[in-house]
Structures are given as structure tokens and as C-alpha cells.
Amino acid sequence: MALNFSHRPFSSHLSEEPMMIANGNWCSSFDNGRKNTGGDASSVDILDVLPSDPFGMDINNTFTAITGWLEDLEDDYNNQYGRRRRDDIWIGDGNRQQLFAGLSFFWNNAMQFQSSGYSYGSESLFGGAFDGSLFSTCKFPESSGENNGFGGALDGDGSCHGAFISASSVDEVLSHENARNGEVVGSSDRCNNGEEDAYVHPAIGFCLYHLRGKDLLSVSMVCKSLHTTVCDDTLLWKHIHICRPLNEKITEEALLHLTERAQGTMQCLRIVDCCRITDDCLKRVVARNRQVVKIGVPGCTRITIDGILSVLRDLKSAGKLQVKHLQLRGLFGVTKDHYDELIDLLNIDNKVKQTIQKPRFYHRGEACVSCDDDRALDIEMCPKCQNFKLVYDCPAEDCKGKKKGSEECRACSLCIQRCYHCGRCIIDTEYEEMFCLELLCAVCSKPTPKLTL
């Protein structure tokens, strides 16, 4: 197919005159294979008219000053810490570039730590992993003694493609290697320093009982001895509470693994807003821990009311039903038949429940529902919409609904709007709507007075 150049924006015949490009060099004209005949010296080019530094930035001197400043920083660093100076970086065709020689200070020493607390001898934490090349492959030496800061976590030549290793890359390498060796993720030889009889101080063991699930998992990754203590102590896993930020990451396999540490002695299981947990996982967990007394699944969208009833029926048929408290906030599709069956399985007396239960106040900012709620069942029928949800009371003493002797202000969050901060009902009162579409009553919307010194 022929190409049509009839509308091209440039001339079909190139000029025989030389042209000057931006770096100041002259480029010979194209002569279609003929010998260079040169151009007319009297020709005027647009670049000849323009000034070399139109904005007065003094680019050449500034560029030289920055290069010298980087070299001074490198010299000061080497003199202060006694490090040998890295070779200059070779770029492209092998010409030595002074700018990149100054920048080598940042590339070669960016991931090194001072010798005050994170190095062994004269070697850096990474065991001399950097070879001074900007685009080369960095090699990690094998662990031999104290020179390797990884504590033998890398095997073979430990090659890692890239200019340097970031903190996240180091964690990833350690995680994969320790997983293959069956060790604790993030542990090192400094924790047990070769002693087989390393143990945890009894005081630390008492402190572990006051930690939550996320903190226990963090402690178990410190060293091998703490990992063994946390995993083998069944008393630490009798009450398992999963909320933010673990709720978004925990899977069914992880939950089964955590509950197995209780060895059948778990008494309380609360998983808040865990979107990956299903009915089948909950049934398997309860089947292995039949002594459970409290079950809370608020906000777990993949758990259904039919799954909860199936778990309770199985426990009752086996004669092992000991569940006395259920938290089902956010569970959809609860009908009157479901609610009556729950009342029957939990053996709840409605008259006693109405007299001794504590009032519940609305507080949207509460990230994790409290486990101290002594209600046998957290949901109940809303007096207004007749749906089974969380029903809130009004904390305000001057509420109009309380003065009339009725419970007009007692309902779910959809039927009655409530203050985001204090939880009082907003009925015929002034309120302020926030940018996030939450409401504040007239009292909470007032700015707090500043203390005068």
C-alpha cells in the first residue's frame, strides 16, 4: 500500500544548511549519501538568537555546587564512621560521571545503620550486601558468625535483584525463609543465643494474660521462647476476641488455627466485622470447643441466622449446649420464628430479661463492641418497625419521651435519629449535621471552652 505524504507538515526537500541542536553542537545536513558539502555560514538559526540562560538561573554553577555538596557529605560520612569510600558508579559506556559519584553516597549508604546499636563489628546490618553498583544485582553472603545481621536467615548465595533492599523486602525474605525452616517469623539467633534451656521470665507470663489477640500474635513473633510460651499456654486462648485491624485480614484457616490453641477449652469467641468467616467455619470451631459460653458474630455478613441455629441445634442434640450469650448485631433476615427458637435454645425467660437488663446507649464511634454485656441475646424487636435489631435507650434525663411515661424514644437506629457523640434521641430538638452525615445534638455541637492560663 502506497503512503500518501501530500499533507505532511514539513518540506519534501531538506535544507542543505547545518542546524544546531540544544547542546550547542552543529549537526551536518542530510545529503542522501553524498559527501558533506557544509552549510552556508551566513545562515541564521533561531537558537543563535536566544540567550544561553534566559531565566538567569546560572544552571552550570548550580549543578557544580550540588555535585560538590554531595561529595562533601560523602567525605564527612566516611571520616565520621570510618567506612571505606565506595567506588564511583559506572554508567552507560563506562565513563566516570562525577555527579553519580556524589550520588553514590545515598544509593550505597541509604540502608546502612550506625554502628551504635544495629551492627556487628565493622560490618553493616546487612552484612555488606551492597556492591556499589546502581543497576547491578546485590549478593548476600552466607551466614558465618556474627557478620550477618540476618542471623542465618538467607541460604545459598542469597541473590536479590535490585539496587538495594527496602524494609518491606527484608521482612518478606525473612518470612519466606523462616516459614521454610519452621521458625518464628522475624526471630533471630540473638533471642536464644544458642542456649537450649532458654525460658521466659515468670513476670512476662503474667503480663501475657492482659494482652489481646493482636498483641499476643505480636509477642509470639519476638523470639522462639516467647513463641512457644504463647502457643502452648491454653489459658491465653480461652477468650478470643477478633476486631480491628485483624478482622479484615483473618481467614477461616487462621481462625481455626487460633482456636486450636485452646485445645477445646475456649469459653468466649467474638469476631467483629469479619467478612471472610462463614457458617461452615463457625460450625467447625464450635464443634472443637463445645465448652464455649459466649458467641459473638456482630457485623459478620457471611454468617446467617440459619447457620447460628444449626450450630445450636447440633450442640443441643449432642447434649453439649452451654451457650448462654449471643451477639448477633448486623445479622439480616431474623424473623419472629428465628427469634423464638433462639429464646428457646438459650433458655431465656422474657420476663426476667426485661427486668434485669441494662440500658443500651447508641455510640457510633465505638469500634469494638464490649464483651461485658450480660445480655443473653443482644437483638430484640424494635417497638416501631417490628424488626429484630439492636434497640437503644435515650441517656438524656430531660427527654420528652421519658416525661410522658412511655418509650417513644426507644427504638433502633433507623427509626430514631440519635446524636453521634452522646447517643440521645433527636426529636423536636436542635441538631447539627456533620460533613460525614452524622448528627450532633445542640449540647455536643457547642465547641469546648479553652482553658485560660
UniProtKB/Swiss-Prot annotation:
It holds the Pfam family F-box-like. InterPro entries: F-box-like_dom_sf, F-box_dom, F-box_LRR-repeat, LRR_dom_sf. Transmembrane segments: none annotated. Pathway: Protein modification; protein ubiquitination. Coiled coil: none annotated. Keywords: Ubl conjugation pathway. One of its GO terms (biological process) is negative regulation of abscisic acid-activated signaling pathway. Residues 34-104 form the F-box domain. One of its GO terms (cellular component) is nucleus. The keyword Cytoplasm does not apply. The F-box is necessary for the interaction with ASK proteins. Component of SCF(ASK-cullin-F-box) E3 ubiquitin ligase complexes, which may mediate the ubiquitination and subsequent proteasomal degradation of target proteins. Part of a SCF (ASK-cullin-F-box) protein ligase complex. Interacts with CUL1, SKP1A/ASK1 and SPK1B/ASK2. This is F-box protein SKIP14. It comes from Arabidopsis thaliana.
